[in-house]
Amino acid sequence: MVSGRVGGDGGVMADVTGSGDERDEDEGLRISEPKRWAAGAPGVGHALARSLTRMGTRRSVRTLRLVNQDHGFDCPGCAWPEPPPGERSAAEFCENGAKAVAEEATRARVTREFFAEHSLADLAGRTGHWLGGQGRLVEPMYRAPDADHYRPISWDAAFTLIARELAALESPDEAAFYTSGRTSNEAAFVYQLFARALGTNNLPDCSNMCHESSGTALTSTIGIGKGSVTLADLEAADLVLVVGQNPGTNHPRMLSSLEKVKRAGGRIVAVNPLPEAALLRFRNPQHARGVVGRGTALADQFLQIRLGGDLALFQALGRRLLDAEDAAPGTVVDHDFIARHTTGFDDYVRHIRGDGGPSVGGLSAAEIAAATGLTGAEIDELAGRMLSAKRVVVCWAMGLTQHAGAVATIQELVNVLLLQGNIGRPGAGVCPVRGHSNVQGDRTMGIWERPTAAFLDALGAEFGFAPPRRHGLDVVDTIRAMRDGRVRVFVGMGGNFVAATPDSAVTEAAIRSCRLTVQVSTTLNRSHAVTGRAALILPTLGRTEADVQVSGPQQVTVEDSMGMVHASRGRLAPAGAQLRSEVAIVCGLAEATFAALARRTAQAATAQAATAQAATETAATETAATAQAVAETVPAVGRTADVDWVGLGGDYARIRAHISRVVPGFDDFEKRLAEPGGFALPHPPRDSRTFPTPSGRAAFTVNTAPALTVPPGHLLLQTIRSHDQYNTTIYGLDDRYRGVRGGRRVVLVHPDDLAALGVADGTHVDLVSVWTDGSTRRAENFRAVSYPTASGCAAAYFPETNVLVPLDATARRSNTPTSKSLVIRLEPTAGRA
């Protein structure tokens, strides 16, 4: 069975992404009307049902009461911040957070008997839902080169095997070290130290596929790639724009903050191609009015924008603000802020006003309407809201970041905020809403293929070595390097690289070309089924579990989406006696690797010395000197033999001590962790209206709206999550807010578009993406569903549709896959009515 194919001019189609039991799973697919509100009693019911099924009653109560509490553990789900400790509820988690906890704290186990029963081919034919549902991984497993099954392996043997492969590489750049956003600060820090001590900056991470565009745009405009608001700022805003984001599914606890905005008199505008339930009304299950009442209407205005039209929208808003300033000088534009703190304003104004006529950034009113799908009156209404607001926050997520023009779009929304001085004052600013719980912290710890010189200088000074300076590989470039034979060893610290990445056929072939792939994981996923010639699964502790090392119980830390750092302490007994923490795994692997490199060095020196004995005394002296030089240069690999990896793995406070001397803002790290709720990292634009850009000022930028041509008979597709899903983890087969139950292979299309294409509602179709080089990619057997999405646009779930995303389809400057703007056509599925 096949769920996707890719072909080019030659017409050759390659099978990818085995569908396994997908057709069986989708046999119960049912479609109903989308919901008009989110959460409420059903949310509580679904959370409890999942928890009780996976964990049982006592375990559920014991675990859920500790989620996001000051002395508990950080939810392994999203990165939305917690309220101050005194303001937290007893149930400071959402429905999807409860699902994430249940997935990790499940009583089910994946044992050696499971792997003996299921071959790799069998596993590769299963769905992500089935794989994740098997339970927790409990012992290291090894797939010998080209073997059909995994077999048990000891930790020492696993470390030795990996170390041997790494030591045998011709260059450290033949290895790549991927990081998932669940990884703690402590694990991320030693992981990047290990990679750089080895001699490479190949540190791709999940941020490359999501908010890399945000970091790139914000660094170039305000000097720091993080959001500028706190939770208190958001809740004090007069106007909040929620753009390209579905908080009800992806960040449900954000809804409580949006409710506070409304109850304080603020206004909310939602900008999105889909009318998501949570953008319309929220029934807060923490309050009686949310359970038995109607809840709170959230969006005062809903702009159903066309995919990719956001840049044109923000330019149109900028033009309207400038025109309003002309009509009433000194009442709209914050000239004092602009003069004191910004650069590029005059160029921005010239670009937006163009020739002085009614055009905006070179676009006519008709072109703006075509790009956005909005009327001039709708844009006027939003501009009016901005004119009357004193404090504006713009929130966004993947709906902005995964387009070819994503970086320019985010720069443009910064332009609009700068016009009114809405950066660096209370209740105003930028709010990129991060996904995985510590994805922002991992970047702070140095998980980045393009580290700054300042970070490398500090790291080198702390550990006494010269870190590599050449930039490494991000996710897309790692796939290319594996495909081309330039990366031979892949190590994944959490996550599900194979399922999360674009162009499934290319990615899976690239992974299979590796000599060794290593996955550090809690549960089974597709990256354990599609592997290199040899593969290892290293099972790790989850957030919910107690981490006890030789120095005693440990705590780890995370950084939320607003730059707050706090501790996380699991309490449950580990799922298996052989589980090791991520920190212990990294430190054990580093110890074994540098020992292997030292042996290699010694062997090289011995060989040189043996050759010298057969030569003249003078030649022998020269050869011995050469051998000594070899001994000194082979571990140019960092000269980190002096790092006490064992000690770091046994006491995480020692890691935090190193972090405090390397990473700005972590002074007195250990002491400040004791503060209730943790501590905030410095953010110059927010804290003091200072901007660490080359000019020392915030930058207005000039951006051109990208032209995206959609041929007749085609649609623009965005890939989305279901409500029973977190990233690539599939908890169930329902997406109840959108009225989809019992299956995932659906494509949501506007009824007018279905009629124009001659496709009846309920028809089974293949999705065929069309790339600029003429190649096509196919995802088979999706049910077309009539749905009120923006006209000309469609939506379908990932990872099933990742096969449609060309590897070369990336955002300019950030190299993020453009999963929100794929040109597709619908073709009838063979053999299905």
What spans do the regions from the language model cover?
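Cofactor-pocket helix-loop regions in the catalytic cores of large enzyme subunits
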Residues: 15-45, 135-437, 459-605, 610, ...
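Short Cys/His-rich Zn2+-coordinating modules
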Residues: 52-62
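Short, non-ligating residues that shape and space the ligands of small metal-coordination modules
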Residues: 84-85
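Short cysteine-rich clusters marking metal-coordination/redox-active sites
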Residues: 72-78
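Low-complexity, highly charged intrinsically disordered N-terminal segments
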Residues: 102-149
